Amino acid sequence: MTIDFDKLQQAINYQFNDLKLARHALTHRSANKFNNERLEFLGDSLLGFLVAEFLFEHFPEASEGELSRLRASMVSKSALVEIALDLNLSEFLLLGDGELKSGGRERESILADSVEAIIAAIYFDGGLTACKQLIISWS
């Protein structure tokens, strides 16, 4: 399967300098050993950090507990799935045949993981500021 990179970039509101990073972020382990799992790992941490920073700056009166609860809800699997659905990321996922046949495009864990992987790909492509701007635009 090929990815319509123009459509992807329009959907996520980001223009990649290196389209290989975008392809890597959307490649599930069922499709290739060169997959998005490591990007997902980094993207999870980037997302947590950037959301924490955003909340810290925008809610100066909030307690640590309140900030933690807000962050948890904003980086939850359900929140990431909602972002993936809003961006129609399932259309761009590269999945193996077995995963496709078993409904992988709708699997919440795959959708949430793809959002985290895209965040890391954007970090490598455009830096932390690009990630921050994108995450804010998605919220």
Language-model features: locations:
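RNase III-family endoribonuclease catalytic core
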Residues: 1-139
